[in-house]
From Swiss-Prot:
The name this protein goes by in its record: NADP-dependent glyceraldehyde-3-phosphate dehydrogenase
PROSITE patterns linked: ALDEHYDE_DEHYDR_CYS, ALDEHYDE_DEHYDR_GLU
Subcellular localization(s) per the UniProt record: Cytoplasm
Sites marked Transition state stabilizer: N169
A single GO cellular-component term on record: cytoplasm
Reactions that this protein is recorded to catalyse: D-glyceraldehyde 3-phosphate + NADP(+) + H2O = (2R)-3-phosphoglycerate + NADPH + 2 H(+)
Amino acids binding NAD(+): G245, G246, D247, T248, G249
Keywords for this protein: Cytoplasm, NADP, Oxidoreductase
Organism: Pisum sativum (Garden pea)
The enzyme's E.C. designation: 1.2.1.9
Phylogenetic placement of the source organism: Eukaryota, Viridiplantae, Streptophyta, Embryophyta, Tracheophyta
Keyword Protein transport assigned: no
């Protein structure tokens, strides 16, 4: 499908180009990678299959461009980011169309992702000027045994080349959440988008290109993970990796060497429901948290842990709401759309079959057509079922009945994941106690898990990640402290 208008330069025939040195290029490999439309299950787009040699050239350009960019005034960096944000919003329709066709994101949600991304870039520009515009001044005599003979000046300087690897489910938003902090902090960026979502990411990168960033500062390489995946993450030219995705991140962390890592690797986000909870509120949040974008969100509700005494009432309320969810193509803004791939659908079906064999109660009939899976609530799930522990990344939600708060906390903490969780109760003291006890990076009280607003800290523990995201944390993570010490010939005291 050919691009039109100002975006036409990024495509050659039916294959989208990759971006390097401020230009859109065809790969010398002569190969391409097909992107399958999850709804039609037919090829929708093609992108370049970049070679390792092309990655080497990108890294050289990124290193060179970063040296000049680090000398660019903060206000100028921010100015260009604001410009990119505005262009991103101008092209929201074209980018959203790609999201609909590449990852089956409902049309309205696709537009929202692009607009949200523009807002993130602008906020990052403003926050970066504040954070990076301030340093620290220390004097030596504040430590015992020292006279005031040393002045210490500290500042934050860029790391160098940042490798950004976003996931398929938010290929634009979770790309700019890495790109914008890196750029405002004075780094260069090499983006490796997911295959599903690569064209949307290329359109997004084109907006940064139109904003006028220096050549080589931003690169976007596409291709097969088997060819350039490890080559990128182990490349000696990379000074930091920001990765969002699955357990591939664990392998990356073992291979990447001594560089800073920012990792978000998924979760099994638990929803603990106490006896005094507002069940209407809980049911609404279970629907929003568990089934939005067909459950393909790291922060989706992945398991409901509800007190036995209110379980029947809650399950009935959720069943009523599940029945009202629309199912169909993303172009129709359906609530439930196809999952991203056939392999994903097969994995989800495997979890469902395991639960069926082991006696879970099906609140709806299991139904699947191609990659489209109808929303399913599974009651009376037990810990011996795979769905109790594994992340389905689909519209299937298990309910585990518990007899005590401690039982719910134990199940939550027994997971190898620790991204987010939530607790519903009218007792704020109990809520805080449970939040403290849950081994999760974030705990929401009386609301479903969520990433955002984008300036909030966002982090996982255990196998859910390394480090913390959010605009401020990402800017800080993509810098290092530089210290300059002025040595005085004799002690100097103010008004001395």
């Amino acid at each position: 499908m050919a691009a039109t208008g100002v975006l036409a330069e990024i495509i050659d025939g039916d294959v989208y180009k990759y971006y390097a040195d401020g230009e859109w290029k065809k790969s010398t490999s002569g190969k391409s990678v097909a992107i399958i439309n999850p709804t039609t299950r037919k090829p929708q787009y093609k992108v370049q299959a970049c070679s390792q040699e092309e990655v080497n050239k990108v890294m050289d350009s990124a290193k060179s461009a970063q040296k000049s960019w680090a000398k660019t005034p903060l206000w100028k960096r921010a100015e260009l980011l604001h410009k990119a944000a505005a262009i991103l919003k101008e092209h929201k329709a074209a980018i959203a169309e790609c999201l609909v066709k590449e990852i089956a994101k409902p049309a309205k949600d696709a537009v929202t992702e692009v607009v949200r991304s523009g807002d993130l870039v602008s906020y990052c520009a403003e926050e970066g000027v504040r954070i990076l515009g301030e340093g620290k001044f220390l004097v030596s005599d504040s430590f015992p045994g020292n006279e005031r003979t040393k002045y210490c000046l500290t500042s934050k300087i860029p790391l160098g080349v940042i490798l950004a690897i976003p996931p398929f489910n938010y290929p634009v938003n979770l790309a700019v959440s890495k790109i914008a902090p890196a750029l405002i902090a004075g780094n260069s960026i090499v983006l490796k988008p997911p295959t599903q979502g690569a064209v949307a990411a290329l359109h997004m990168v084109h907006c940064f290109h139109l904003a006028g960033f220096p050549k080589g500062l931003i690169s976007c390489v596409t291709g097969k993970g088997s060819e350039i995946g490890d080559f990128l993450t182990m490349h000696p030219g990379v000074n930091c990796i920001s990765f969002t995705g699955g357990d591939t991140g664990i392998a990356i962390s073992k291979k990447s060497g001594m560089i800073p890592l920012q990792m978000e690797l998924g979760g099994k986000d638990a929803c603990i429901v106490l006896e005094d909870a507002d069940l209407d509120l809980v049911a609404a949040n279970i629907i929003k948290g568990g089934f939005s974008y067909s459950g393909q969100r790291c922060t989706a509700v992945k398991v409901v842990l509800v007190m036995e005494s209110v379980a029947d009432a809650l399950v009935e309320k959720v069943k009523v709401k599940v029945a009202k969810l629309s199912v169909g193509p993303p172009e129709d803004d359906s609530d439930i759309t196809p999952v991203v791939s056939e392999s994903s659908a097969n994995f989800i079906e495997g979890l469902v079959n395991d639960a069926k064999e082991k006696g879970a109660t099906f609140c709806q009939e299991y139904k699947r057509e191609g990659n489209l899976i109808w929303p399913l609530l599974l009651d009376n799930v037990r810990p011996d079922m795979r769905i109790a522990w594994e992340e389905p990344f689909g519209p299937v939600l298990p309910v585990i009945r518990i007899n005590s708060v401690e039982e719910g906390i134990h199940h939550c903490n027994a997971s190898n994941f620790g991204l987010q969780g939530c607790v519903f109760t009218k007792d704020i003291n109990k809520a805080i106690m449970i939040s403290d006890a849950m081994e999760s990076g974030t705990v929401q009280i009386n609301s479903a898990p969520a990433r955002g607003p984008d300036h909030f800290p966002f982090q996982g523990i255990k196998d859910s990640g390394i480090g913390s995201q959010g605009i401020t944390n990402s800017i800080n993570m993509m810098t290092k402290v530089k210290t300059t010490v002025i040595n005085l010939p004799s002690p100097s005291y103010t008004m001395g």
